Amino acid sequence: ASFDAHERKFIVDLWAKVDVAQCGADALSRMLIVYPWKRRYFEHFGKMCNAHDILHNSKVQEHGKKVLASFGEAVKHLDNIKGHFANLSKLHCEKFHVDPENFKLLGDIIIIVLAAHHPEDFSVECHAAFQKLVRQVAAALAAEYH
């Protein structure tokens, strides 16, 4: 589904205010704390026994920034999200063997983080636009899975 002018404005305007490093670290940390079984994908990041370890893990913070920066590319490619994420989908499917359900979970967490960091901007219309965006990104990342 394509984005109308109002949805695009909500997405672009809010994204311009996002601190990618802070929100990315927050989003990935939240996923690893709320869904501890997801830590198995990141065992090489070192000690992650509890929330404190995760919140202070520099590798989690760096990867969170990388993940959210990649998500931000969707904002620049609203007309071709699936095409833009084709290589990343293949990588996560074939090399990392990530369960595609993780993309939906992380998308939902990104929504929570954006709302928490930008409550004054996160109207119900903005929420709807970003929910549509995270669904499309999750579907694009899952496209290589059979």
Swiss-Prot record:
The modification N-acetylalanine is found at A1. Belongs to the globin family. Involved in oxygen transport from the lung to the various peripheral tissues. Heme b binds at H63, H92. InterPro entries: Globin, Globin-like_sf, Globin/Proto, Hemoglobin_b, Hemoglobin_oxygen_transport. Heterotetramer of two alpha chains and two beta chains. It comes from Alligator mississippiensis. Red blood cells. Residues 2-146 form the Globin domain. One of its GO terms (biological process) is hydrogen peroxide catabolic process. Keywords: Acetylation, Heme, Iron, Metal-binding, Oxygen transport, Transport. GO terms for cellular component: blood microparticle; haptoglobin-hemoglobin complex; hemoglobin complex. Transmembrane segments: none annotated. The gene is HBB. GO terms for molecular function: haptoglobin binding; heme binding; metal ion binding; organic acid binding; oxygen binding; oxygen carrier activity; peroxidase activity. This is Hemoglobin subunit beta.
